[in-house]
Amino acid sequence: MAFAAAAALAHFQELIPGSEFAGEDSRVVDLDIVFTHPMSNGPVMEMGKPVEFGVLVGGGKTDLMSSLKEKKVDGKTAYSASYKVKRPGDHVFYIAPAPYWEPAEEKMIIHYTKVVVDAFGGEDGWDAMVGFPVEIKPLTRPYGLWTGNIFRGVVMRNGEPVPFAEIEVEYLNKGGEVAIPDDAFDTQVVKADANGTFAYAMPRAGWWAFAALVDGPKMRNPEGKTVDSELGGLIWVRCRDMVGKK
């Protein structure tokens, strides 16, 4: 029972585009923004208004807060947004959500999240850093990946690698299509090496989240009490199956 409860507490901020590619026939990137447990297909947690939402492309940031549209998912507040790409190159969409109070863990949670969309085959800037307090720097280009490919990254905190950082990994299990034989399969866990570098082979086509978790500063919860906090640096990566020619 204790293990099941612990496994259920793996929160992930979703920032999912309709595709990891944008081009002449698909200039508009639609983003789905939900705070939930992706592998167990819920439950969904209430989101406050994000602190920051934008896109990094060509070394410059664009504030996209005005594009956020509030919606309800399973009765909880979530968001969506659309962005029309204007130039070739990798677009790093990012969000700094409002701190979330998790009573079961007695801590505030902030998961700084990003996803990379390649526009018009530009393929430059996929490892650009947003500058979050904790962030994963990809060593593997985070798109154009086949199922079974290995994703590698470095966990960074305030610009420095985090030795032996813990990374939680979950699959976006839409509709609960993947059966979970035991709670241990819900959230995969890997540790970075002494240089903050980690690797994971993605066994199924779809979206995968990599969440590097570190202890954050003391914060105040909704009741005004001083509590611990958890900072997460997340990146979403999609892999696809190889399909034979028809």
Q: Where are these predicted regions, by residue range?
A:
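Short flexible loop/turn segments that cap and initiate beta-strands
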Residues: 43-52, 160-168
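Short, surface-exposed beta-strand/beta-hairpin micro-motifs centered on an aromatic residue
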Residues: 80-83, 195-201
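Short, aromatic- and glycine-rich surface loops/edge beta-strands on solvent-exposed regions
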Residues: 87-101, 208-214
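N-terminal signal peptide c-region/cleavage motif recognized by signal peptidases
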Residues: 5-7
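Short amphipathic, basic-aromatic surface patches that mediate peripheral association
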Residues: 35-43, 157
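Short acidic/polar inter-strand loop motif in beta-rich domains
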Residues: 40, 98-105, 216-222
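Beta-strand-rich domain onsets/edges
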Residues: 11-30, 106-165, 171-175, 225-246
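Short, acidic Ser/Thr/Gly-rich low-complexity loop/linker segments typical of extracellular
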Residues: 176-195
